[in-house]
């Protein structure tokens, strides 16, 4: 079975490979992360993904539901992260909206909740809680 466009992206993210993930985007592709950061163009996307992945020791993304219509993929994803400082964040729910195009991914939007970047946490008292958890952007 051929992996879906979203499967290819999640595999690159789980390998912590910003170059491979960015290479999937069209030259004028766009990215919106859960915490509101945006990138337009493959180099800006590579930089944003590199900053994000550089904060991690590991990450896993598990697709729990997936819909596909023409060039659009929508997926519910559970993400888990281990940060460089050993903090583990598990089973964080995300929605990925991916628009594919002839030159690569035209747009990726990741939804969950607006929050601060990963590196901005200081202690459990300083993080922005969403319910009882703090959520990273991808």
Which positions does each model-derived feature cover?
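Short, aromatic-enriched amphipathic alpha-helices that serve as compact interaction elements
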Residues: 1-17
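Alpha-helical elements of Rossmann-like donor-binding domains used by nucleotide-donor carbohydrate transfer enzymes
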Residues: 8, 20, 44-47
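Short beta-edge strand/loop motif at the mouth of beta-sheet-based domains
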Residues: 34-47, 68-70
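A beta-strand edge to alpha-helix "cap/lid" segment located at domain peripheries
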Residues: 1, 47-138
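A short gly/proline-enriched turn/hairpin at secondary-structure junctions
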Residues: 30-40, 52-55
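Short alpha-helical functional segments enriched in proximate histidine and acidic residues
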Residues: 12, 24, 52-55
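Short, ordered coil/turn segments that flank beta-strands lining enzyme active or ligand-binding pockets
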Residues: 27, 34, 101
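Short, well-ordered alpha-helical segments enriched in acidic and aromatic residues
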Residues: 16-28
């Amino acid at each position: 079975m051929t992996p879906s466009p979203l499967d290819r992206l999640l595999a690159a993210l789980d390998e912590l490979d910003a170059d491979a993930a960015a290479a999937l985007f069209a030259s004028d592709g766009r990215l919106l992360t859960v915490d509101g950061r945006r990138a337009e163009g493959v180099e800006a996307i590579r930089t944003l993904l590199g900053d994000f992945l550089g904060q991690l020791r590991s990450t896993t993304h598990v697709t729990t539901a997936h819909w596909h219509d023409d060039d659009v993929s929508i997926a519910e994803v559970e993400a888990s992260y281990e940060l460089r400082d050993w903090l583990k964040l598990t089973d964080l729910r995300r929605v990925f909206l991916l628009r594919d195009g002839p030159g690569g991914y035209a747009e990726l939007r990741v939804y969950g909740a607006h929050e601060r970047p990963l590196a901005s946490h200081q202690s459990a008292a300083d993080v922005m809680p969403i319910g009882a958890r703090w959520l990273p952007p991808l």
